[in-house]
Amino acid sequence: MSTEPSVAKDAVLKRSEALAENTPQVSGYDFNEGLDYSKLFESYVNTGFQATNLGLAIREINRMLDCRDQPLEADQIDSHETDDFIRRRSKCTVFLGYTSNLVSSGLRETIRFLAEHRMIDCIVTTAGGVEEDFIKCLAPTFMGSFELSGRDLRERGINRIGNLLVPNDNYCKFEDWVMPLLDEMLEEQKSQGTIWSPSKIIHRLGERIGDPSSIYYWAAKNQIPVFCPALTDGSLGDMMYFHSFRQPGLVVDILSDLRRLNTMAVKAVNSGMIIVGGGVIKHHICNANLMRNGADYSVFINTASEFDGSDSGARPDEAISWGKIRKDATPVKVYAEASLVFPLIVGETFAKRHHCAGKELPRETNQV
């Protein structure tokens, strides 16, 4: 009888070194114990793959909120700040960033919940993230399919965002609503010397929409600044373009917003970043936190990869190299499509705290 080759045996049966004593073991949720969603999400940390990242993101945000819940010390109260929107409010300033497609989707209601109950301190979004919120106050967005023909939809005057459908009439209604407000802003600029910035424009629109289903209605009501460094890159920019022919002269100052955003970061006792999506919103928040030598808490949610060197795909460790996240922080990136995971994360963090604290408030009746 022949013996197995020693080279093969040594290769297959190579002895292992012991792992560190505190290394967690892989373990999933046992449904024999019943259905407890909190325990289910707690089990994600040791499930592996992106379930682990999701579980760690929930932990990171809860640590962020634990810090935010602490009262300011007497010497930390920002009594000299005259801008109510950027005044320090807690021991952790929470920056929320998201892209326009999330507002087009049902995540709008998740984001509105955060603004409604003043659970965040600052928003950074894109032009679409602004206009889509207001447009939904004027007319609905519909479910469609990724496979619908673009040629047929164009002939019917229907725009597709993934598997969502937006009739072009919605943008016509938006034009009817926003043009008089742009006239009003131009008149204030001429008569009162008002210097408009993207955040001030969004605040004015939020005040005028009069609809509590709107994110920016609540941002205006709760004095949450909304920054949009690319305000003209969307339908709102289209309206401003048309307005520049009808009533030329409106000036938008982006530098004052940069100063406000960076000042919020510099003032922060601790800083937390929750960035859903990539592109300009991700870098704008991260770069503001560079001004304080990095954020203390960070969660990124997107599907981008780092192989192409894009900022969207960059892992948190790359941000640490730039000083945008602190060296001793425990940041998390969840590689997932946001509509799948962001409501779950909010449910296990912000919403759980809100409802467990008995802070449920009566909702206002929707009105346009």
Swiss-Prot record:
The keyword NAD applies. SUPFAM superfamilies: DHS-like NAD/FAD-binding domain. One of its GO terms (molecular function) is deoxyhypusine synthase activity. GO terms for biological process: negative regulation of reactive oxygen species metabolic process; protein modification process; spermidine metabolic process. Spermidine binds at E131, E132, D238, H283, G309, S310, D311, E318, A319, I320, S321, W322, G323, K324. Pathway: Protein modification; eIF5A hypusination. Its EC number is 2.5.1.46. GO terms for cellular component: cytoplasm. Keywords: Hypusine biosynthesis, NAD, Transferase. Its cofactor is NAD(+). The keyword Phosphoprotein does not apply. NAD(+) binds at residues 100-104, 126-128, 132, 233, 278, 303-304, 337-338. The active site is at K324. It comes from the Eukaryota. It catalyses: [eIF5A protein]-L-lysine + spermidine = [eIF5A protein]-deoxyhypusine + propane-1,3-diamine. Belongs to the deoxyhypusine synthase family. Catalyzes the NAD-dependent oxidative cleavage of spermidine and the subsequent transfer of the butylamine moiety of spermidine to the epsilon-amino group of a specific lysine residue of the eIF-5A precursor protein to form the intermediate deoxyhypusine residue. NCBIfam families: dhys. This is Probable deoxyhypusine synthase. The lineage of its organism: Eukaryota, Metazoa, Ecdysozoa, Arthropoda, Hexapoda.
